[in-house]
Every structure is written in C-alpha cells, then in structure tokens.
Amino acid sequence: MPFSVTSDSKYVFFERTKRTWDEVDVCSVNTSTLEVKELIHEVDKPYRDPHARSVEVLNDGKDILFRSERTGWGHYYHYDGQGNLKNAISSGPWVSGHIAAIDTLQRTVYFYGYGDDPKINPFYYRLYKSNMDREGATLLTKEDGQHRVIFLKSKRYFIDTFSRVDMEPKILLKDNTGKVIMELAKPDLSQVYAAGWKKPENFVVKAADNVTDLYGVMWKPSNFDPEKKYPIISVVYPGPYFGFVPTNFTLDDSYCTRMAQLGFIVITVGHRGDTPMRGKAYHRYGYGNMRDYPLEDDKYAIEQLAQRHSFIDGKKVGIYGHSGGGFMAAAAICTYPDFYKAAVSCSGNHDNSIYNRGWGECYNGVREVEKVVKDSLGNETKEYEYKFRVKSNAEIAKNLKGHLMLVTGDIDKNVNPAHTYRMAQALIEAGKDFDMLVIPGAGHGYGSADEYFEKKMYRFFAKHLLGDTRADYWGDINRSK
C-alpha cells in the first residue's frame, strides 16, 4: 500500500510483509513518538498475492478497507482506524477486484468483481457497488462483456465502455444505480469488415483435471476454409499475477490476427494458476512449481480443440510467448517434445533463481530456517536463513526434439539476457540445434526492431509448421512492387 498520512501529519499508515510472503501487517506510526502500532495482522498461506492486495485508508484514518482472501475468495473488509473489524463489504464464491471509485461522503465503494454469474466469463470485469458499513454488493453493469468505467467527479454518473472479443465496444452514460442515461458513441467498423477482417471466437475447454473450465480465444485466417487442416499455434503467458487471454474487442493482440493470416489457427487459453481473478484455490495451483504448472493444461486444451474441430491439425503444434510466456514456451517444447513441434521463446525468465528475488520467492516459495548461533562468549542469538529452489529450463534442455528459437534484447533490464544465454549454453552442451536472435540495443520490448523480429517469427513458424521453404527468403514486403 502507499503511505497514507493524516491531515494533521500526526500519523502515517503503512504495510509491511514478511519475506515468506505469508504474513502482512497494516500499521500506523506516531510521527512524534515514532511508536508503531499494528492495526491488522493477516496470515495467508501459502502467500498473500502482492498484485491483488488492496488497502485503503479513508476519512483521515478513521476507516480502513482491507482486501483479504481469508475465505478462499478475495473480498473487502471494513476496519476502524484502531484495527477493529467492523464488517465484511462483499462475500460469496466470487472475487472482488480493484476499486474503481470511493465516495466517502456517501460511504460507498465501487469495485470490479469477477465470477458472480456462472453463465458469464469469470474474467470479465463488472462493476459493483457497496456501502462500507454493511455487507452486500449490487451489480451495476449487467451486460455480458468486459467493462471499463470512468466516474464523473460527483460520483453520480459514470461512463461504461464494454465489449467482448466478438462484440464491438458500446459506450454508455449511466447513473450510480446502473441505469442507462444515453449511448455516447458507436464505432463504425464497416471499412474494417469490408477489408476482410474477421472477429476472433471465444471457446471453453477443460483443464487437465477434467473439472475446471478454461476460457480461450481463437483466431482464424480471413480466408478460412473449414475443409482444410491448419497447424495450431498457442500464444501463452503463465501468469501468475494476471492472465493474458484477451477479453475486450481489439483488431489485433500480440500478433495473433496477423499470424493467423499465414495459414494458422492461433489460440490463447487460460490455465490453472494464471490469475487471482478466479479465487485462491485456482490461483495458488502453481505454487512451488513455477516452471511446469501451466504446461499440462495448455497441451490438453489443444488436444480437445483438435478433437472438436476437424480443421485443426493436432500433429502440427507451435507455441509462442514473451517474458513469462517465453519461459513457458521453451519449457513446453522441452517437457512435451513429441507434442510441440516449434516454439518461439522471447525474453524468457528461464532461470528464476537469477530473476527478481521477490517474484520467485513469492510465487514459488521460500523456506525460512531458524538457527541458534553462539558468539565467542557463548551468548545465543537466533538467525534466519532463507532457502529457495526453483526448476529452470536449462535442466530440461536435453529433451528438445522440435524447433526452438530463442530471442532476447541485449540490454533487457527486466529479464536479464543471462536467462537466454544460460538456456542457449544448456542446449549447446546437449548438442541441440536451435535458432537464436539477440537484438542490439533492445530491452524487454524490441522497439524499432519489433517488425524485424515479427518477420523472423513468421518465417520460423511457416518453415517448421507449414513446410514452406520460401520462408528462408528474406525481403522487405513494405518495399516490394
């Protein structure tokens, strides 16, 4: 939480978290005496999610809103300024997400929620309203879609923009009861459709447990022929702090539309452990196994789609991902080497022992070991060691059978290029053939070299999944006559 200071500057509120990420305190400190008072203490095993957490100090420190997953579902709780629990604000087998607005005069909280209606995609943001002094939430945006709202200063009205990948945006002015006042704008996409653009399609499959529903999106070529068979490419991101699967209307998303035009079925699908938006049990699925947890679900989702649709060639499977998705793409082709035939792995954190320490220790787990140490006089003191072990892609590089392209920028400040270099070294030591692209001057994103990378990726997949040897030809299509 950010620091919050009372208007008289006498008290500062802050949050502190244990290194094992499973205990958190909300505290106040007296700026005159420097006395620290613990107001809220929360134990949340195996970890408290650092990205979905939320603490709001209101009314000059008299009210605190604290988001907790203590019931297995993320909801808000109202405490007074001394840390006494007053009431839950929301409850039930669904998730209360980030706060959109707070009206302190009316003591009303507006927040997004997910998964309250089993008939609607649980990843869709929908706006709810609660009085902070009692339990209960009212849904204000009932339309089936992904909602984004902007409140007017008075909090009496808000602009609601909602869409789906297969539905154009609608922009409505509503009052704070959810009543529609008027439609503000309507997009005209007639020229886009006239050019041949096709909407992607939503789908639902089962996770590898054959119980959990997974939600995905499929892109087809604009000249799609249901009588043909198409290779399939899975565009992935493992989370665990958010899911990648798009939910709102867009003309392109992470190369998916453009890649499909080469003659591929392109999908992106969720998996257990990818996001906190579906409750604690779903989100913590990957704890202790950062490398492997999303792989089985991705493979099983593709197998189901290939069985469901005769136009999908389940023997020609590719996978692409960036950052955590790059980590996942390389892990997938080395874990299931007979299933995935080609993988493009970009800027992947292939060895989380050298990535951001907090990231790995939170989502994979760190073990606290207490020991007693004696000094030269025999005095005993307690010390703590923290032990961290995580699986790396280098450990399974020897399994590679298909075609792998590694990509990194050479000045990546997020995922150090050493991750890719370690993976490359392991592949070389295992005698594996692979492609590699290092982009000079590029960081975690590829900037002006992005188009260059994009063409390299398209040619790579065309060659290894379509068998198109013309992909070895290099030319600038923007300058062709």
Regions found by a protein language model. Give the residues of each.
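Multi-bladed beta-propeller domains
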Residues: 1, 29-53, 79-105, 114-119, ...
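Beta-propeller domains
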Residues: 1-24, 44-62, 73, 95, ...
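Residue-level recognition of a conserved intra-blade site in WD40 beta-propeller repeats
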Residues: 5, 57, 101-102, 151
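Serine-hydrolase catalytic core recognition
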Residues: 9, 15, 146-481
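Beta-strand C-termini and the immediately following turn/loop, strongest in propeller blades
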Residues: 13-20, 55-71, 89-90, 103, ...
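Hydrophobic helix-coil surface modules that form long, contiguous segments used
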Residues: 14, 22-24, 33-43, 241, ...
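A short loop-to-beta-strand structural motif that recurs across blades of beta-propeller domains
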Residues: 25-27, 75-77, 126-128, 170-172
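Active-site-adjacent structural elements in folded domains
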Residues: 40-43, 47-51, 61, 93, ...
